[in-house]
Amino acid sequence: MKGREYEDLAARYLKSKGYQILGRNLRSPYGEIDILAEFEGRKVIVEVKGSETFFPAEKVTPHKLSKIIRTAYEVLGEEPFSIEVVVVYRGKVYHYKDLGLEL
């Protein structure tokens, strides 16, 4: 699988859980938002990581989260949002909702 395929799988998974996909690959000078969604009336920034050889959750570093947050503020302004991570590892989806980041 390649990056786009991981994001496609993540988007299908999120839709199956009731998320509305609002945008994908949204860029700012600070970085990129893989998926912008809405769930139960709130905006959700979803970072997608995938790998077939190692569990990729370690790629979501504090530096990466900082870039995601700056990009989210650039895209959403002052609108509240949360950040979630979807990891695709060997074809299985892992969804991390509660990162303690309700901004």
Swiss-Prot record:
InterPro entries: Restrct_endonuc-II-like, tRNA_endonuc-like_dom_sf, UPF0102_YraN-like. GO terms for molecular function: nucleic acid binding. Pfam families: UPF0102 (PF02021). It comes from the Bacteria. Belongs to the UPF0102 family. This is UPF0102 protein aq_041. It comes from Aquifex aeolicus (strain VF5). The lineage of its organism: Bacteria, Pseudomonadati, Aquificota, Aquificia, Aquificales.
